[in-house]
């Protein structure tokens, strides 16, 4: 039987400024355990806003977000941070690495101290699968954009969260590495029953997903 792990109910989000932008309009979507889903759409369609709302990094103006059946909308900043640490791995489009830490230190940072000691071999194997083991002791400024992106991906996967949310995870990679990342995410979804939601502008990467969701003008126009 399918199990809901992530849900948005009628969420809306408007960005106000000189020009008011309605990024999401009464959007509802359910993600089940072990799914690998791709969200596609043109730039400015609302796909990254939806991902940030699902990750509790952005607050919808209306509607509700549920994680593992728990209503998280309206919780305090500290409560949301706790939920993210336990249940969500997030892959940022702009890497979001700490410049004062090495690649390895960036990856283990979200992991509990005791688990870091026990899981060094596992983390090194993960880095090897992403072809960044040689970056273990390098700082972000010493790595290419593609290497930094793969460190960001390793950090999200290392915490073994139930949900992985990825904002353009292959955007800074060449075709071969992009395919490797998409395949790795797909396998992680299958082997560990992780729910993976990937925002991408690349139709070829979306083909790796079990389900494709298209966002157009802040609304879901395709969900299959």
Language-model features: locations:
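ABC family nucleotide-binding domain
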Residues: 5-6, 11-27, 31-208, 212
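H-loop (His-switch) and adjacent beta-strand-loop-beta switch element
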Residues: 212-224
């Amino acid at each position: 039987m399918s199990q809901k792990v992530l849900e948005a109910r009628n969420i809306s989000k408007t960005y106000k400024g000189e020009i008011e932008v309605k990024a999401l309009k009464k959007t509802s979507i359910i993600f089940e355990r072990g799914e690998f889903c791709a969200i596609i759409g043109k730039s400015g369609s609302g796909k990254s806003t939806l991902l940030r709302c699902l990750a509790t990094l952005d607050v919808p103006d209306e509607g509700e977000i549920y994680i593992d059946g728990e209503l998280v909308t309206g919780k305090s900043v500290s409560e949301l941070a706790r939920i993210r640490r336990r249940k969500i791995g997030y892959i940022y489009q702009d890497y979001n690495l700490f410049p004062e830490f090495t690649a390895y230190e960036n990856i283990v940072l979200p992991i509990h101290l005791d688990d870091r000691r026990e899981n060094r071999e596992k983390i090194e194997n993960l880095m090897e699968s992403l072809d960044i083991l040689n970056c273990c002791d390098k700082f972000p400024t010493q790595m290419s954009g593609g290497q930094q992106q793969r460190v960001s991906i390793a950090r999200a996967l290392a915490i073994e969260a139930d949900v992985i949310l990825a904002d353009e995870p292959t955007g800074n990679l060449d075709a071969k590495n992009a395919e490797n990342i998409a395949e790795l995410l797909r396998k992680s979804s299958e082997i560990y029953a992780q729910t993976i939601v990937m925002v991408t502008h690349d139709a070829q990467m979306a083909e790796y997903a079990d389900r494709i969701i298209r966002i157009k003008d802040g609304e879901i126009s395709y969900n299959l």
